[in-house]
């Protein structure tokens, strides 16, 4: 019961708690806590100011990310990032926080480079690699096609 990470957006959270999206958004911290009480594990309440809550009382607000992330597949990419971090033996809460931060920073870098409109989940891949590997030196081919800077 405690070995899970739940990653709802506000609409999914509202369905899980039997309330309205407005109620979820009116107090995101309380909503994450309510989800945690009901489902245990770690809760990642996605959205503006993503809330990560763990059963041990830890709570983090991830302020990275932007409105361009409100597109199909973004949650799948986030889950994949978190899963990869779990595969590297991070604890649930730490993997959720690190995954949300990397995901959000990659989206912010991408938005600064090409704008938020029309952002696709697959657009994050090349930027994400550079976000999690900041010391990698880019080649001329990288710079001409998909520069991080």
Descriptions of predicted regions:
Residues 28-36, 92-106, 121-129, 144:
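Short, well-structured alpha-helical segments that form the helix of a local strand-helix-strand
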Residues 105-149:
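Charged C-terminal helix
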Residues 12, 31, 80-81, 106:
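A general alpha-helix detector
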Residues 22, 76, 87-88, 130, ...:
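Short, well-ordered loop/turn and helix-capping segments at boundaries between secondary-structure elements
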Residues 15, 71-102:
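Short, small-residue alpha-helix embedded
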Residues 8-10, 45-47, 54, 63-64, ...:
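Active-site proximal loops enriched in glycine and acidic residues that flank catalytic Cys/His/Asp
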Residues 16-17, 62-69, 79, 83, ...:
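Short beta-alpha connecting loops at secondary-structure transitions
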Residues 1-64, 135-149:
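Glycine-rich phosphate/dinucleotide-binding loop and adjoining beta-alpha-beta core of small-molecule
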């Amino acid at each position: 019961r405690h070995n899970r990470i739940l990653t709802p957006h506000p609409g999914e959270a509202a369905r899980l708690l039997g309330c309205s999206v407005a109620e979820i958004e009116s107090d995101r911290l309380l909503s994450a806590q309510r989800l945690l009480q009901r489902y245990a594990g770690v809760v990642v309440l996605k959205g503006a100011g993503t809330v990560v809550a763990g059963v041990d009382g830890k709570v983090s607000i991830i302020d990275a990310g932007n409105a361009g992330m409100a597109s199909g597949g973004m949650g799948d990419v986030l889950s994949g990032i978190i899963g990869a971090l779990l595969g590297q033996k991070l604890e649930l809460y730490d993997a959720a926080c690190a995954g949300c931060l990397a995901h959000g920073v990659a989206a912010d870098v991408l938005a600064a480079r090409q704008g938020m409109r029309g952002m696709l989940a697959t657009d994050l891949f090349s930027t994400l690699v550079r976000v999690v590997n900041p010391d990698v030196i880019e080649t001329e081919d990288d710079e001409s096609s998909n520069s991080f800077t």
